[in-house]
Amino acid sequence: MKNLAVITGGSGGIGSAIAKVLIPQGYSVVLSGRNEARLAEVVSQLKQQFHDASITAVAADLSEETGRGALLDHVAASPTPLSLVINNAGAGLFGLFEDIPPSELQRVFNINVTAPMLFTQAVLKRLGSAGADLQIINIGSTFGTIGYPGFAGYCATKFALRGWSEALDREYSGSAIRIRYFAPRATRTELNTDAVNAMNEALGVTMDSAEAVAREFSTFLSGRRHSAHIGWPERFFVWLNKVLPNVVSSALAKQVPVIKEYASKR
């Protein structure tokens, strides 16, 4: 085996799809997730497909210190050196901002931002000084660069994740550690509510499969770029939002009535 890869949110669509592209590259894989039964099911499916692969799992809530510790202990006990951490675990949040309960805003921020930050900090303290190359890749979103109505709380988490990734990568410049950021566009996963799926269809939003995202991730992993956004025209709008944000605001304003309609059904 090449090296060890840890995938948080490993029981979900994108996490398990990424595992399927890493295993043929020689990685031993550790999957982490909160749903123990679902995690066991994913591991069983992967082992049926990849008979000789090293695939293990840790059921853990990474928003809790005990969960982070359990995953880190498992990784530290492996004879295979850690070379890749993929912070993929996350939660969606759709709705008009004033309608979202404060507890829900706090819960999603903890899952999407605080948990990956604290787990990464623990990895760096305990395993990051071994001198071996280590990549930490944070899975973000197009909504980490473009503020989108109906997703204000979710955007806040992904903007935070992107900024932290950029700052931390610069903090480790000149070392063997890299922190990178990979941003899918809308993806068909169980994180989407029925209202989100219906709204995307009404707006003509292209949604990628988890497998397509994983293929793009594999390409990104083999390169050297700090960050990548996938999908067209999303990449164009990411650029446009940087140079002419008012143009993007005008375009999105036309979608607000539809967004409000589906937000009321969330």
What are the functions of these language-model segments?
Residues S11-G12:
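Conserved glycine-rich cofactor-binding loop
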Residues Q25-V42:
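Conserved glycine-rich Rossmann-like NAD(P)H-binding loop of the short-chain dehydrogenase/reductase
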Residues N88-L93:
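Conserved NAD(P)H cofactor-binding loop of Rossmann-fold oxidoreductase domains
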